[in-house]
């Protein structure tokens, strides 16, 4: 069954836009020494900030299915800095003592999305979902990090306000209290860093991100008419179980591949364990008016009506 959250989310975001935010999400300091390294030399030279959003107590599973916190919206949540560039995002789900919350312990990070309230979203700015602001980072249970090439970063300004959408599941019969943890590598705003604009590509664009697939191999498309021309430097993808890969191609250049993000699945194929990422300076140069096509490819033994096909790209505007 498709998730119906558009109306409450739209009402909440409209309210936030009118009153300029709401109460911040609770964020606690991480345990001593809890700082995840990144693979980028640029990120290594930056300072590290860890923010934990929560706590979230997920109800226990019942005979009807897993316990769930379903698309909980929080307004004006904590940022890692007031005036900086973010060089990398590393997501996780943890318990209060800092240990990882995983499927093995019953907890699942179905997804979370961060949005910057007063910035225009590149692909849904004219839609009701644009009230959420610019979607600039997200993760599913695969917990893919976004690390930018040296000299690039996502700008944070003192007047920005962030929103957070969280969806969590609990497969165990007992409640689980968890935190969404994000490790940020940051640089000061006065440093020489080239700014990035996030672009959200989605098969079910500007809706709930879910769509249906048949049994067997399927390749579902969504086309973006480029309105953020420039250098694409980083891309990452998100799929559900039985997902094979998600790819962005430039159809105006004969289908040239920009990024092919490949899924690594669990042994039963039901769970995505990781997604490959693409990074380059640049991966590609895109021009205004070109057509970038999103391909979401599944190989499922049965039909499904709740899969996703998403890529998040970061562009240095021309």
Describe every region a protein language model picked out.
Residues 33-231, 236-318:
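Beta-strand-centric surfaces of beta-sandwich/beta-rich domains
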Residues 1-29:
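Secretory targeting and sorting signals
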